[in-house]
Each structure stands twice: as C-alpha cells, then as structure tokens.
C-alpha cells in the first residue's frame, strides 16, 4: 500500500523518495490528497517565510514559485497544453494533436500568465490574513479533484499516453477513498469550521465539473494534460472563494 504513496510523491513532486513504485499506478490515486497536504504544507512554509520578513507581496511570490518548483511545473504545463488544444484546435483530432506538441502557443501563454497573476492575487490576500489552512486546503482539494476525473472519465487517446497507467484501473474505490480523505483534511485544516469548509468545497466542485464538462465536449475524455489543468483551476477556484470569504462576501450565510 505504501508503494502507492511512493508513486504519488514521485509523480506529483520533485521530492526524492526511497522505495519501490506501485505495481499498479492507479493505487497511487488513493494518496493524492495526502500528497496534496505535503505540497500545501511546503507552500505554506514559503508563505510564512515571506510574512516573517513583513512583506506580504514576497510571501505570495514565494508561495507561488515554491509550488511551481515543487511540482516541476507539471500541472501548469498541462494547463498550457489544454488551453492551446481546446481553444486552438477546430476538432477533437486537432485538439489532441496540438496538446501533444511540446511548444507553448498563444493560448497556452495567456493561460499561464493569467494563472500566475490570479494565484498571486489570491495568495497575497490569504497570506495577509494568515489564512494558511486555506492555502493548504486549495492544494489538497486540487489533487483530490484529479482523482475524481481519473476515476469517472475515459482516457481520450486510443493509443494511450502518459496518464494511461493511472486512469485505466481507476474506479469507485479510488474516488470514494480520495473524496473522504480530501474532505476530512479540508475540515482539519480549517479547524472543523463548517461554513468556510463548505464554501471552499463548493468552489472546488464547480471548477471540477467545469473542467470535466469542457474536456468531454472538446475531446470526449481526459488526458494527463487535462488532469494537470484540473489541478491548477481547482486550486485557483478554492483560493478565490477563500479570498472572497475573508473579504466578507459570504457573510450572509455565515
């Protein structure tokens, strides 16, 4: 079972991890929320370092860059490929072909710039408020969302791809375990506060369903790039609604 954790850490981070990979890569999906907690914890350390210097803007930059470096920019690369393929391809075949191109096009560049700016703004607000649990929660929920997509949507490429080994055996057990783990970690990180936890969960679900709907419409399934893009967009959605919560825009339901 721990071999799944090894595979999840090696897949989602640059951390050097001893041990053997899982025989079935899909078993690593059980551990995605836990690895999200590890990544989120490190991102929080970067944010705290910046705040320790009395510089919220630096805290947001350190958290942003720390997250990208820790994950090799893997998910950001997936988002760029998705943007190029989905908005630059006229049909399913063209979209899949463009997504496989290692070069980043105009749509991908715009997506990356937009993501970095949006993340920086949200992280700045969260760091200023000392809402470190919300920062970590965004990372946990984004990795949980990847499991839900992998478990419920087919792989789009008939010839397979880099994420095939993770998706082909994924099913309800992975979805249920990851969902429960992700929600429990969310509530722990937010000190069992029901309203803010529910708001963050709602934001993640909206982003998840949007990515799933768009991917089904454009290519009829998912790829590794879609899973990466899902992580980025869910993370942003969670941090955004968290920032709105801190600004009192959900006070009517508190």
From Swiss-Prot:
Reactions this protein catalyses: alpha-ribazole + adenosylcob(III)inamide-GDP = adenosylcob(III)alamin + GMP + H(+); alpha-ribazole 5'-phosphate + adenosylcob(III)inamide-GDP = adenosylcob(III)alamin 5'-phosphate + GMP + H(+)
Membrane-topology annotation of the record: Multi-pass membrane protein
Key words, A-Z: Cell inner membrane, Cell membrane, Cobalamin biosynthesis, Magnesium, Membrane, Transferase, Transmembrane, Transmembrane helix
InterPro entries recorded: CobS (IPR003805)
Cellular compartment(s): Cell inner membrane
Membrane-spanning segments: 27-47, 50-70, 104-124, 131-151, 170-190, 194-214, 233-253
Record's GO cellular component terms: plasma membrane
Cofactor(s), by name: Mg(2+)
Protein's pathway: Cofactor biosynthesis; adenosylcobalamin biosynthesis; adenosylcobalamin from cob(II)yrinate a,c-diamide: step 7/7
EC top class, as a word: transferase
GO biological process: cobalamin biosynthetic process
UniProt keyword Chaperone present: no
GO molecular function: adenosylcobinamide-GDP ribazoletransferase activity; cobalamin 5'-phosphate synthase activity
EC number: 2.7.8.26
UniProt similarity note: Belongs to the CobS family.
PANTHER family: ADENOSYLCOBINAMIDE-GDP RIBAZOLETRANSFERASE
Role this protein plays: Joins adenosylcobinamide-GDP and alpha-ribazole to generate adenosylcobalamin (Ado-cobalamin). Also synthesizes adenosylcobalamin 5'-phosphate from adenosylcobinamide-GDP and alpha-ribazole 5'-phosphate.
Protein's recorded name: Adenosylcobinamide-GDP ribazoletransferase
Source species of the chain: Chlorobaculum parvum (strain DSM 263 / NCIMB 8327)
């Amino acid at each position: 079972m721990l071999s799944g954790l090894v595979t999840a850490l090696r897949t989602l981070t640059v951390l050097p991890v001893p041990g053997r990979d899982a025989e079935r890569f899909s078993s690593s999906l059980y551990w995605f929320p836990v690895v999200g907690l590890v990544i989120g914890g490190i991102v929080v350390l970067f944010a705290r370092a910046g705040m320790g210097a009395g510089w919220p803007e630096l805290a947001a930059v350190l958290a942003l860059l720390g997250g990208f470096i820790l994950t090799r920019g893997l998910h950001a690369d997936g988002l760029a490929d998705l943007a190029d393929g989905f908005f630059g391809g006229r049909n399913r075949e063209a979209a899949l072909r463009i997504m496989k191109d290692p070069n980043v096009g105009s749509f991908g560049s715009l997506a990356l710039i937009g993501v970095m700016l949006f993340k920086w703004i949200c992280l700045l607000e969260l760091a200023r408020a000392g809402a470190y649990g919300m920062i970590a929660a965004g990372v946990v929920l984004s990795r949980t969302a990847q499991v839900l997509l992998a478990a419920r949507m087919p792989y789009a490429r008939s010839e397979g791809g880099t994420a095939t080994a993770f998706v082909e055996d994924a099913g309800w057990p992975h979805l249920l375990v990851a969902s429960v783990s992700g929600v429990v970690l969310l509530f722990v990180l937010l000190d069992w506060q029901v309203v803010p936890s529910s708001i963050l969960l709602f934001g993640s679900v909206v982003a998840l369903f949007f990515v799933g709907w768009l991917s089904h419409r454009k290519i009829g399934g998912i790829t590794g790039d879609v899973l990466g893009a899902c992580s980025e967009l869910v993370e942003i959605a969670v941090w955004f609604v968290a920032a709105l919560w801190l600004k009192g825009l959900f006070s009517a339901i508190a």
